[in-house]
Amino acid sequence: MIDVNEFDQIRIGLATADAIRMWSNGEVKKPETINYRTLKPEKDGLFCEKIFGPTKDWECYCGKYKRVRFKGIICERCGVEVTRSKVRRERMGHIELAAPAVHIWYLRGTRSWLAYLLTGNEPREDLKAKQLEKVIYFAANLVVGVDEDRRHEDLPELEKELVDERTAIEEERDRELDRRQEDLETELSEMEAEGGTEADLRARRKAAEKDLTFAREQYEQELDVLDRAWEEFKSLFSRQIIEDEMLWRELEDRWGDYFDGGMGADALAQLIDQIDFDKEEITLRSMIDPPEGERPLSVQRRQKSIKRLKIVAAFNRRDEHGRRVNEPRAMILDVVPVIPPDLRPMVQLDGGRFATSDLNDLYRRVINRNNRLKRLLDLGAPRIIVN
């Protein structure tokens, strides 16, 4: 083990998914802690001996290897290394997440570091913490990028296609409503010929008119969504938040090739990956202190740009090997570290009950939900259920 007295200094930074996997001795796949009958750790669970080391000095899980002479041997039967039990104070595990999750520290707080980082340089590209929260919790969609050149080039052709489709829908609506009206008149004539009462005729006409109104409204709604989607698509820009799910589906189905986006932490991860931090830092510096002849920013926007520059510059810091000191992508978790079991112990009380650390309950909840999500994804469940 490392001696605490050997350190001159310590630096705290963001841990990347690869770093967490490197620290880890294995993936924790099951939420179980110990078997309450044998009182031994469950395999692949939160106290697994294969991952964290043996509970008894110089003894593997199955008991095949005992004593110090087998030091360093990994049992071929149970996979546990024969070593001291104190390694359970230092060996870590990890949980592979089925879907990425945003670290709450960087979303909420006195400042939302994610909101400052992901905000664009134009006023319309401003992103607030509450908006990001909606994206993260699957209540809104985020436009990550737009192929503006291709859209501009194809816009006349797309508009012509839209006009043709709109005309076709209107013609279909008129035909359908005329057909229903004719069917109603024929039915009423037959009822009258068969001696139907005035009350019956009136009731049938009222029901039919209700159906006609509903059908007309359905067509109007379809045309309205089409018009709204087209207007939205023409002015679509990166970092735009769209809360209307029906409108987003229409945009994605029709013109999904022209833009990228989505909801959840995945969308934020895509946006972070698109940021060129070197270019962004230069742009922000020129915005804060513009060259002579250029219009300066307002006081409020200048203050915001200064705060954003601090974050971008901090993420742009490099070590002696040219690697980033802190990776911004690490604010979004793909892997959760599991601390050593002896730092979150289970203690047996009188009467056979156990006292356990709150961390074990937290890990158990994360693993249960993660496994449930993995099963849904493996089954190919619809997106609306997964989200």
Labelled PLM ranges:
Residues 1-387:
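Extended, highly charged clamp/arch subdomains and adjacent linkers
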